[in-house]
Amino acid sequence: MITNYFSIIHVYFIFLKIYLIRKGELVMKKILLLIAFMLLTLTGCGEKNIDDAINDFSKDVENSKSYKLNGTMEISSGEEIFTYNIDTYFLKDDYYKVILVNQTNNHEQIILKNPDGLYVVTPSLNKSFKFDSVWPENSSQAYLLQNLVNDVKNDSEATLEKTEDGYIIKSTVNYPNNEELTYQKIYFDNDMNIKKVEVYNAEDIVKIKVTFKSVDLKAKLDEDDFLLDDLIDTETNTENNTQTNENNANTECTGENCENQNTCEGENCEEQTNATLDSIIYPLYIPSNTHLSSSETIDTETGERVILTFSGDKNFVIVEEVAKVSNEFEVIPVFGDPLMLNESVGALSSNSISWHSDNISYYLVSSDLSTNELISVAKSLGNASTVISTK
């Protein structure tokens, strides 16, 4: 009887031991799963994936009611690099102001968009192009945060790279007027603050680089910061131009050898009021089977105008004249889009480009050239272009 009793107790302890072992294993499994989950959570917090990065970036931009960016933009063209100081202002909804100052010649232009329209203002000439355009929604823009967000969201194959300094998002770009540009890299610090944008061609060469010195996503801007009238000091420009004209008109001479005077006395003195071109600038890029067929210089009421005609498979005309300062602020309607050339922001239409550079106004027109060919010809009329003196 006693033996049977101890046998029962022994069996009971065996089952109890098995139960405790199994229960312990279950507890250990739960502990291990908890530890694994915590490790995964910590790992996820340490390094983002592409979706996390895009969400963080887009959330910051979309939550911003207005922002202000300051930095530099470099545009590479051949062996030359053109550098701009750039300030970007944005206010919801659809208010933009981009101030570009060429570091080489201090030439300033301003891209402005408000409910009245889209403008490219050149204060030094007291002029502005006014566009019938949906800019900036119709293309990528390395200096506008909304466009960068759209680029990465629209690229299902965008990638994320973790670096020592932060993150790099790589995505495709959409530059319909520049097929050379294919992809971009957007650089962030470890807190996903944007630092730099590089736009590449198919040969992995950086063609555009925007470096942000400061980014304020909580800028206190209002509609008054986007007024066209504030960009042009019309009264000051008018006074300066009037004073210049008066000074020219009052400059007189009486000798036979007087030169370069606006008014004078004497038989051999001639009135010299018109602006003259010191040189003719020819494009370095000319499409194949196309040649310069004529070069004509004509006198207009405001100065000399050079007309270069190119004939062949791709006919086109280039008009060059000294840029004229308007006494009153002038708005020139354009059906097209702003175009960033090497040294200037121009106006691109379906068959022409207009722009100002180094005190010369250019107009390029053709019914044969494609948009990319138009741009190639225009860009080749830069500092490296063939220059022939007219004197």
What would you call each of these model-derived segments?
Residues 32, 41-95, 156-161, 256, ...:
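N-terminal leader/targeting segments and the immediate start of mature chains
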Residues 87-143, 201-211, 364:
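An acidic-aromatic
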Residues 3-27:
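Short, Lys/Arg-enriched N-terminal segments with co-localized hydrophobic residues
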Residues 49, 115-178, 390-391:
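Flexible, processing/modification-adjacent segments and terminal tails
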Residues 19-43:
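Sec-dependent bacterial lipoprotein signal peptides
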Residues 164-232:
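Gly/Pro-enriched, hydrophobic low-complexity segments
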Residues 46-121, 168, 173-178, 182-190, ...:
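N-terminal mature ectodomain segment of secretory-pathway/periplasmic proteins
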Residues 246-358:
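Short, solvent-exposed recognition patches
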